[in-house]
Amino acid sequence: KEVPSKDLGMMAMAYGHVYVASVAFGDNDSQTVRAFLEAESYEGPSFNIAYSHCIAHGYNLADGLDHQKMAVECGAWPLYRFDPRRTAMGENPLKLDSRAPKISFEEYALSETRFRMLMKTNPERSKRLLEEAQRVVQAKYDMYQQLANLHYGSDADQETN
């Protein structure tokens, strides 16, 4: 695609009172379980966004968990939990659970037929889109990291005075 996809998690977080998590049990099963337990215990609306492999991605579904891991490792699928209850405790509601990208988006993308098809039919466009996707993925991770590092509570109050 020529434009980045919508960030449904960020849209839900903007409401401020919705529990939101992004999970991929193929990368971090304990984070997935923790997110589901937190969402279950939350009194308000909760929204868990789970990476799901699909036959249309063009790989053996027996390798689905490995592809989930690659999606997280390249930054295309950041893992996080946004729990509004943390603000009442003076804590940042956003916890970024994934690490900084350690493989390229291209490495992840070219492991799936849905992306390789464009490389075969239109290599120039594919190269351009892969480069742009890498920039978008890195910018998205950087934004989540900045938001997760914001200070809340009494420390934040003192910094603004």
Q: Positions of the model-derived regions?
A:
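Conserved acidic/glycine
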Residues: 65-161
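Glycine-rich ThDP/TPP pyrophosphate-binding loop and its adjacent helix/strand module
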Residues: 1-100
